[in-house]
Amino acid sequence: MRLIHALLAIALILPVPASATVRVVATLPSLAAIAREVGGPDATVESMLPPNIDPHFADAKPSLVVTLSRADLLVENGLELEVGWLPALVQQSRNAKIATGANGRFDASTVVRRLEVPRGPVDRAQGDVHPGGNPHFLYDPRAGAAVVRALAARLAAIDPTHAAGFQSRAANVASELETFARTETAAFATLPAGHRTVVTYHRSLIYLCDWLGLTSPISVEPRPGVAPDPAHVAKVLAQLKSLPARVILQEEFYPTSTTTTLARLGAAALVSVEGGTRFDKGKRYIDHLRAISTSIRAALAK
């Protein structure tokens, strides 16, 4: 706690540049990549997490408190994806701009279509089920386009001087994402029907499947966030062979021992996708999605 307070004190005495831009902090690298494109030269953007970290279980590092203390706008995924670590960091930052309900707090989940919204009560026996719906919507460029437009409106409200720039850049990015989404949907539709069934490790790729017209009847995890047991692995293998499913999909931060074995025994390809945009490498959000769709289509076409 003393370290956090010391870091905050240093952050608060640092001067703000005369040519100050909106300081945006995004919880996820894909959100940061979106914010960077919309903000352009009128915003500085930081990502709290790299793409190879599972956002469910990120570490609440003291350095992130300092980052949040200086933010004009916090962009979060929402739907409780960051609930295990973000609230404490925001509280410790003592930054009223990014408090819940403040204009400097942008919840991307409020502007997208949600999948897998539970109809009844949710408890831990069901695994890591999110009461508001599946939070992994950033794997769908159609959702990304909605976030782009809404984020531009929020940036314009915070910095009206540069509103025209935010809106113009957002219009271009959103249009590009929507065109890309339609193109890829059409391309996947040309695959034989029997080539469009996949098995996912976690339920995090459901929006991806919805976008690309893929069927995912079973996951390697028996319940979200619960490690596979031998009985469930045997069930998955049986479905791999009977469907058949040609591809097993998983994000890079999940273990591969079980999926590698399943792929070998089930004569399926294992495709590991990036957990988010390589924001630190200067990659664009659409680059991230294009790499994923290209690798999956190539595996399904074999």
PLM regions: where:
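Bacterial N-terminal signal peptides
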Residues: 4-15
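Extracytoplasmic metal-acquisition and chelation regions
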Residues: 20-302
